[in-house]
Structure formats: C-alpha cells, structure tokens
From Swiss-Prot:
GO terms for cellular component: nucleus. Belongs to the Antp homeobox family. This is Homeobox protein Hox-A7. GO terms for biological process: anterior/posterior pattern specification. It comes from Salmo salar. The gene is hoxa7. The keyword Repeat does not apply.
Length: 75
C-alpha cells in the first residue's frame, strides 16, 4: 500500500518547525497533542520528526566534522 507524499499546510509546517526548535524528540503524549491540534495522525507527526532530524543531521554534519578537524590538528 503506497501512500502519496503528505503536503503540510504552512501553518502545520510552522507549528512543527517551532516544536522541533525546542525539542528534536517528542514524547508520545506531546505527539498526541500536536496531532490533535494540527489535525494530523500521530504517524504523520512521527515521520515528519524523523525526516526533520535527518535533515538537521545533514545540515550540521559539516560543522561537527570541521570542529573535530581543528581539535585534532592541535595535538
């Protein structure tokens, strides 16, 4: 059963981003609350956060590797 990709409204995206800014991981309780407020399923919230964490990791990958390099070069 293949699902089409979900498109989120501007409001939903904004709220999810705001939540992510404060917390990269959600408790089940918080996920239920957000799902209710944004009229999304828990599954959609869970997957949005998983995808967002991957994007965050990718965006911050270079920063951590470059700071590691400078720390190593001092030895």
């Amino acid at each position: 059963r293949k699902r089409g990709s979900q498109t989120y409204t501007r409001y939903q995206t904004l709220e999810l981003e705001k939540e992510f800014h404060f917390n990269r991981y959600l408790t089940r309780r918080r996920r239920v609350e957000i799902a209710h407020v944004l009229c999304l399923t828990e599954r959609q919230i869970k997957i949005w956060f998983q995808n967002r964490r991957m994007k965050w990791k990718k965006d911050h990958k270079d920063e951590s590797s470059s700071s590691n390099l400078s720390a190593n070069s001092e030895n």
